[in-house]
A protein has these predicted regions:
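C-terminal cap of thioredoxin/glutaredoxin-like
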Residues: 1-19, 93-183
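Structural alpha/beta surface segment adjacent to cysteine/selenocysteine redox centers
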Residues: 1-101
C-alpha cells in the first residue's frame, strides 16, 4: 500500500519528507501484528486489493516475492540520496522495480542495480547505502516512528496530524487544504 500511496502523494504538489523505517520493527515496538503476513487468507485478500487499487490509479502491478526483498537495503538507498528529490526518485524506482516489474531486490547490489536501471545516478547510493551513518539514520527513523505512534505503513503526517493507509489520502488532501486556508 505504500507504493500506491506514494504514487498519489507525488501528485499533490507538496514537499514530502521521506523517513524510511524498518516497518516490522516499528510494528513490534508498538505491539502491532502484521496480519497480512500471519494470516494467509488476509494476505491473499490484500494481494487482490492491491491490484484493484493499482488499476484505479493506472499504475503497474506485478509484485515480486515480498519476503525475498531486502527492505532495509531499500530504505538505506533512499536515505543515501543527496536531496529530497533524489530520495523521491529513488523511492519511486525501487517501488516500481518491486511492485510493478516483479524484480527481487535481495541485497544492496540488487537495490543499486534497480536504481541505475531507472536512469538515476547511483554513485551516492553506492557510497552510502551500507555506511554506519546510513544504518544509524535508519535506526533513528525507526525509533522516531514508534515514538510518534506509527503502527504501519503507509503513514503520512501533515503537521502533527497522522493518517494511516492508502485509503486515507482524501483526509490528507483535506488537511493540506485546511492548513492552506488557515495560512
Amino acid at each position: 500500500y505504500s507504493y500506491l500511496a506514494f504514487t498519489q502523494l507525488r501528485q499533490m504538489d507538496v514537499a514530502i519528507a521521506l523517513k524510511p523505517m524498518k516497518i516490522l520493527e516499528v510494528m513490534e515496538k508498538v505491539g502491532n501484528v502484521p496480519t497480512t503476513i500471519t494470516c494467509a487468507v488476509k494476505g491473499r485478500y490484500a494481494r487482490a486489493d492491491l491490484g484493484r487499487w493499482a488499476q484505479r490509479y493506472g499504475i503497474g502491478f506485478n509484485p515480486s516475492d515480498m519476503r525475498a526483498n531486502d527492505g532495509e537495503a531499500c530504505s538505506r538507498a533512499v536515505l543515501s540520496a543527496s536531496t529530497p528529490q533524489d530520495a523521491a526518485d529513488i523511492t519511486l524506482a525501487l517501488y516500481q522495480a518491486i511492485w510493478s516489474e516483479g524484480k527481487t531486490l535481495a541485497n544492496s547490489a540488487d537495490v543499486v542495480a534497480a536504481v541505475s536501471a531507472h536512469g538515476i545516478d547511483a554513485s551516492g547510493v553506492v557510497a552510502r547505502i551500507d555506511s554506519p551513518a546510513t544504518v544509524a539514520k535508519l535506526k533513528a527513523n525507526t525509533d522516531e516512528a514508534a515514538e510518534r505512534g506509527v503502527f504501519g505503513s503507509p503513514t503520512t503526517f501533515v503537521g502533527v496530524a497522522m493518517f494511516f493507509g492508502n485509503d486515507r489520502l482524501d483526509f490528507v488532501r483535506e488537511e493540506l487544504a485546511r492548513l492552506e486556508e488557515a495560512a
